[in-house]
Design a protein with these regions (language model features):
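Residue-level marker of regulatory loop/turn positions in helix-turn-helix DNA-binding domains and
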Residues: 50
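Conserved helicase motor core of SF1/SF2 NTP-dependent helicases
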Residues: 2-4, 16, 37-46, 54-60, ...
Length: 254
């Protein structure tokens, strides 16, 4: 290939690259974000079950007739991970306009975090870090910061959900065993059109007294009086996929 043709080809490639960059920043300046642009997406979002119980959970997540999905079981079984992936997939497909991440602000055992400076995202970030870590697998830090700023991804304490109406949103309540029965009832009654609520947790890993364990209370109520619009999934130690040692650690503390 001649130098002239090589130079022309390089110039054309640079022009296309600059067009992509210009489009990207124009979209940001116009306060829009296109989740379908291939240069903005790290990888496709696929929910692949690795056990029968995970398959049941994914079916509940993808079932439009299930307005609320409740899942409980030990650490490392994919409760939070699969729930977050389903929410991101719904957001990317335009099935919802935002994702709301929440959890009870209850410290592990006697651990005290004290006062955290900054806005609500900064204050809640340590509490929802596992959910944000999943988000960062699929979007760059710049994209994550943008979505937080525009409240496409919203972080809120569970107590702040009182009085709100969640419309066209997927809401994920993590560590639900640390919520009280009244808090979980409050959250579920906030649902509105086009929304889904995912409630995850481990009834055995509560930092509250047993009678205050909202997740344990909810699962008991659902087993006694099933509701067709609420999907219920249970995981066991056999569903642990994070690391094989977790099952042995849990048995060690039984």
């Amino acid at each position: 290939m001649s130098k002239r043709k090589t130079g022309a080809l390089r110039k054309e490639q640079n022009s296309k690259k600059m067009h992509k960059i210009t489009t990207y920043y124009n979209n940001e300046s116009n306060n829009t974000i296109d989740f379908n642009q291939t240069h903005k997406i790290k990888k496709s979002i696929e929910l692949v079950p690795q056990s029968v119980n995970q398959e049941n959970y994914i079916l509940n997540l993808m079932d439009n007739s299930k307005d609320i999905v409740v899942v409980y079981g030990p650490a490392g079984t994919g409760k939070t991970y699969l729930g977050m992936l389903a929410a991101l997939k719904a957001l990317r497909q335009g099935d919802c306009k935002k994702i709301i991440l929440t959890r009870p602000a209850v410290a592990v055992d006697d651990e005290k975090h004290g006062f955290l400076p900054g806005d609500i995202n900064s204050k809640m970030e340590p509490w929802v870090r596992p959910l944000l870590d999943i988000l960062k697998e699929y979007y760059s830090m710049k994209e994550v910061e943008y979505m937080l700023k525009e409240q496409i991804i919203e972080i809120t304490p569970l107590a702040f959900c009182r009085g709100r109406n969640f419309k066209n949103a997927w809401v994920i309540l993590d560590e639900a065993q640390n919520a009280t029965p009244s808090q979980i009832k409050m959250l579920m009654t906030r649902i509105s059109f086009g929304s889904k609520i995912i409630i995850t947790g481990d009834v055995e890993q509560t930092d509250r007294r047993t009678k205050d364990n909202g997740l344990l209370d909810l699962t008991y109520r659902l087993t006694q009086n099933p509701v067709s619009e609420i999907g219920l999934s249970e995981f066991s130690v056999k569903d642990i996929r994070r690391h094989r040692i977790i099952e042995k650690v849990l048995k060690l503390y039984d």
